Design a protein with these regions (language model features):
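Sec-dependent N-terminal signal peptides
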Residues: 9-18
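Alpha-helical protein-protein interaction scaffolds
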Residues: 29-114
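N-terminal secretory signal peptides that target proteins for export/translocation
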Residues: 1-9
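N-terminal signal peptide c-region/cleavage motif recognized by signal peptidases
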Residues: 21-26
Length: 114
């Protein structure tokens, strides 16, 4: 009787564990941050959606640029504060200004990126 009860508990535990694992993988988006979800959207080519989820101004600018939202991308690149991407942001600012036919502004941004 005791062995049968042990097998029953082991079987129930295995079923419970399997159910929890399935639920966790099915709804793993629940456990991901907005930044992680935005990165997934960016990888899927959903650039406008990704831009809304990024809190980092550089990443937001890149997503907006890829979405063709050049004015907003330029604003994001102008507000980048992280030193490790500042030169890249200025270069990308030059690209956005070029796309907006602001050629003088593009040259200024390119020079500032050096």
């Amino acid at each position: 009787m005791r062995a049968q009860r042990h097998r029953c508990l082991t079987g129930r535990s295995a079923l419970l564990l399997a159910g929890l694992l399935c639920a966790a993988t099915a709804d793993s988006a629940w456990f991901r941050t907005a930044e992680q979800q935005a990165a997934d959207q960016f990888e899927d080519g959903e650039y406008s959606e990704a831009a809304e989820g990024f809190s980092d101004t550089y990443r937001r600018g890149v997503a907006l640029y890829r979405a063709g939202r050049y004015t907003e991308a330029g604003n994001a690149f102008e507000n980048v504060e992280r030193e490790e991407v500042k030169a890249d942001a200025l270069y990308n600012l030059g690209n956005t200004r070029y796309k907006l036919s602001d050629f003088e502004g593009a040259v200024d941004a390119y020079e500032d990126s050096l």
